[in-house]
């Protein structure tokens, strides 16, 4: 009732509202709007009030996700006047999405220096063409799987089917109506899959089963590097990559073991069968059979006081890994991209030494640090 009596022009009230908006509302509720005028094709200035209030939350690279679901990594710089500017990669985003003069772009912050972008024409109507930009990131993986899989057309088609199922779901609030025949083709398999999830949940795991997996343990940093064989060699890390990753200043607690994992495009799909494989050595040493079937994940660098995601950890005869809705939410909320490198730091209780499998937290807790290759080098995404 008190709020209703406050005058519309009360400066104290406005300051209080500003404070609540920027300091207490969820970040994914925050937006900014900008018009494409002047020389907009080479760079774009982020509104200063938005940039100032997000100081420290926007890294040297941001991810822009168009309505099609495709994501661009854009380099960030500061102008001579201190303005935050999107530069490297911005022109490619503009060209691919057909952004023209006097168009209006609405940016919604989606976490981890990431934005969902809607594009409107000068009349104020959303443009249709950005919804249909080819997602070459997923296409590259499908082509690789088909080329190196050797007679796995069924797998390839299945992967493509999951992609078709994902796209309308994620953009359902903006898509036009789909003809009934198309709906049957897109969603009929998903209905049938609901009844056989437990039977086939391992069919779409990534390719780090025992026979295709190698683990390199860095004795000093206790990094466990996974190598993916077979059809997913594009996600392998070279020796130079591993050395560079080991040099990145990641806030890992001394003595905590770290699983280093490259994220596949398939890990980011809405398929309920996708599993992020964990190496047998790491799982056997630190996530043994006596451990709970749930892992708590937190973003690294937060000191354990931030958001948490409860992720299912599954074990099967020849594989083990993170699986299910909890993992998909973690990947979505943190803006993970294919080829990101996740460092899963298992937090041990104080005083637990190397190989001490009894002195873990009651429920396994992992701080996840994310590295991304930007202009040829790995950087820590905060």
UniProtKB/Swiss-Prot annotation:
Q: Which InterPro entries match?
A: B3_DNA-bd, DNA-bd_pseudobarrel_sf, REM16-like
Q: Does the keyword Hydrolase apply?
A: no
For whether the record's keyword set contains Iron, the answer is: no
Q: Where is the composition biased (Basic and acidic residues)?
A: 136-158, 193-202
GO cellular component annotations of the record: nucleus
Q: Where is the composition biased (Acidic residues)?
A: 203-218
Record's subcellular location: Nucleus
Sorted keywords for this record are:
DNA-binding, Nucleus, Repeat, Transcription, Transcription regulation
| DNA-binding stretch(es), residue numbering of this chain | 29-123, 261-363
> Which Pfam families does the record associate with it?
B3
Which residue ranges are recorded for the region named Disordered? 136-222
The terms under GO molecular function for this entry are: DNA binding
Its signal peptide is none
Domain of life, per UniProt, equals Eukaryota
Among PANTHER family, the record links this protein to: B3 DOMAIN-CONTAINING PROTEIN OS03G0622200, B3 DOMAIN-CONTAINING PROTEIN OS11G0197600-RELATED
Protein's UniProt name: B3 domain-containing protein Os03g0622100
Give the organism, scientific name.
Oryza sativa subsp. japonica (Rice)
**What high-level taxonomic lineage is stated for the organism?**
Eukaryota, Viridiplantae, Streptophyta, Embryophyta, Tracheophyta
